[in-house]
UniProtKB/Swiss-Prot annotation:
This is NADPH-dependent 7-cyano-7-deazaguanine reductase. Pathway: tRNA modification; tRNA-queuosine biosynthesis. Homodimer. It catalyses: 7-aminomethyl-7-carbaguanine + 2 NADP(+) = 7-cyano-7-deazaguanine + 2 NADPH + 3 H(+). Keywords: Cytoplasm, NADP, Oxidoreductase, Queuosine biosynthesis. NADPH binds at S90, K91, R258, G259. InterPro entries: GTP-CH-I_C/QueF (IPR043133), NADPH_dep_7-cyano-7-deazaG_red (IPR050084), QueF (IPR029500), QueF_N (IPR029139), QueF_type2 (IPR016428). It comes from Escherichia fergusonii (strain ATCC 35469 / DSM 13698 / CCUG 18766 / IAM 14443 / JCM 21226 / LMG 7866 / NBRC 102419 / NCTC 12128 / CDC 0568-73). It is found in: Cytoplasm. One of its GO terms (molecular function) is preQ1 synthase activity. It is an enzyme of class 1 (oxidoreductase). The keyword Cell membrane does not apply. Its EC number is 1.7.1.13.
Length: 282
C-alpha cells in the first residue's frame, strides 16, 4: 500500500466511482493528481529533480464531428512534461475524450489546440499534442524495446510485495559497463481501484554492473503495489539511482492500454530518446 493512498487530494477523483458518460465537450471532466504525492515520500522536490522526461499517451478512441456533422476519427499522441504540477488521471481523460464525440469542431487543428489547451490547464505544465489520420499509421510494424531481456531466469519467487531492498548490494566490480535491460514482467495496480496494470520496462544505465536476478526480483515485487504508472516509473528510477548509483540512468515503461489509452512514462538523467512505437501487447 502506498503511503499516500488515502490522501485527501484523491477523494474527489471520479476513478472508482459510477459516472455518467457525456458526449458533448466538457473540459471540466479532466482531473489532475499532484505529482508531489509520490515525489515527497521519495525525497524529490520540484526544484531539484534528478531526472527529466515525459509521460507519453496514445489516444486510440478519439472522435468528434466536423463542421457539417460528419464523424471524424484520429489517433492522438500526447506528451506531458515531467515538470508539470499534476499528472492526468486516466479515467477522467477517457471521460473528457468521450465528451468530444457529439461536438462539432471546424477543423482538426481546432481539436488539437483544444486538447493541448485543456491538458495544459489540468496538468499545470507543458503538453504537446499531435493527431494522426489512420492511413498515416497503417502498416507500421510492431515495435520492441531494444535491450537484453532478463525475464527467462531459472529462479524461484514467492514474495510479491514491493521491496526496494532487493537492490541492496546489487552492483559488483569496479568496471563501468553500459547496458540496456528489458523486462515484460512489470505488473502493478491502480492506486484507487487496484485493477492490474501491465507493462514492459526498459532500463538503460552506465555504471557498475547490476545483478540481473536482483533487478528482476525487485521489478516483480511491484506485483501487489498500488501506484499510478508515472509514479511507479519514478520510484524505479529513484531506487536504482539511490541503491545502484549508476553514472547515467534511463527508465522507460510502456503499459498496455485501458479505456482506449496507453501511458508510457520515461525518466532519464542523460541523453535518452524513447522509441514510441506500439509494442506487441499494446
Amino acid at each position: 500500500m502506498s503511503s499516500y493512498e488515502n490522501h485527501q487530494a484523491l477523494h474527489s477523483l471520479t476513478l472508482g466511482k459510477s459516472t455518467d458518460y457525456r458526449d458533448t465537450y466538457d473540459a471540466s471532466l479532466l482531473q489532475g493528481v499532484p505529482r508531489s504525492l509520490n515525489r515527497d515520500p521519495l525525497g524529490l522536490t520540484a526544484d531539484n529533480l534528478p531526472f527529466h522526461g515525459a509521460d507519453i499517451w496514445t489516444l486510440y478512441e478519439l472522435s468528434w464531428l466536423n463542421a457539417k456533422g460528419l464523424p471524424q476519427v484520429a489517433v492522438g499522441h500526447v506528451e506531458l512534461d515531467y515538470t508539470s504540477v499534476n499528472l492526468i488521471e486516466s479515467k477522467s481523460f477517457k471521460l473528457y475524450l468521450n465528451s468530444f464525440n457529439q461536438t462539432r469542431f471546424d477543423s482538426w487543428e481546432d481539436v488539437r489546440q483544444t486538447l493541448e489547451r485543456d491538458l495544459r490547464a489540468c496538468a499545470q505544465g507543458e503538453v504537446s499534442v499531435a493527431l494522426y489520420q489512420l492511413d498515416e499509421l497503417e502498416g507500421q510494424p510492431i515495435a520492441h524495446l531494444h535491450g537484453t531481456c532478463i525475464d527467462n531466469q531459472d529462479i524461484e519467487i514467492d514474495h510479491y510485495d514491493f521491496n526496494a531492498d532487493y537492490l541492496q548490494n546489487a552492483t559488483s566490480g569496479e568496471k563501468v559497463v553500459e547496458e540496456t535491460l528489458v523486462s515484460h514482467l512489470l505488473k502493478s495496480n491502480c492506486l484507487i481501484t487496484h485493477q492490474p496494470d501491465w507493462g514492459s520496462i526498459q532500463i538503460q544505465y552506465r555504471g557498475r554492473k547490476i545483478d540481473r536476478e536482483k533487478l528482476l526480483r525487485y521489478l516483480v515485487s511491484f506485483r501487489h503495489h498500488n501506484e499510478f504508472h508515472e509514479q511507479c516509473v519514478e520510484r524505479i528510477f529513484s531506487d536504482i539511482l539511490r541503491l545502484c548509483q549508476p553514472e547515467e540512468l534511463s527508465v522507460y515503461a510502456r503499459y498496455t492500454r485501458r479505456g482506449g489509452l496507453d501511458i508510457n512514462p520515461w525518466r532519464s538523467n542523460c541523453n535518452f530518446q524513447p522509441s514510441t512505437g506500439r509494442l506487441v501487447r499494446q
